[in-house]
Amino acid sequence: MPELHLRVKSPCALLFFYTLLLAVDSTGVFRLSILCALLHECGHIMVFIALEHRLPALEASLAGLCLSMRGVLLSPGRELLLAAAGPAVNLLLAGTMLAWMDGPAGYSYFGLWFASTNLLVGGFNLLPVPGLDGWRIAGCLRQLVQYRLRCHSTYPYI
């Protein structure tokens, strides 16, 4: 059975930070944020397994949990799928929860916080900022557009 490789950066600081936040989180929002972040990463992991047929290496740090892409070369299209998988999971879960609450289940405190936190995690990760999924998505789209323009530039449109 394949093994999951997890690298923890600054384990003492990470443990202290999480322990402190969990101790003062009387509303449960931090626990819900951790759940939504883990679900986000599960989206990336599922697509990585589908593309590469192996488990990815993971890194945990104060910035969060992320896939380690060291030594993994993907085409821009495959990297686009991988980068979009995490936010897609969050947005899908938020939409599903809102649709479920709009039906027979009715609105609940947990449901609203779960949907809101998923929207926040998914939306935040779509920002085109270095280190986030949005940056990788924008880079992949740029590469795909440049490739498409390069391929069609040999044929004049006149």
What are these regions (language model features)?
Residues 1-158:
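Hydrophobic transmembrane alpha-helices and their immediate loop junctions
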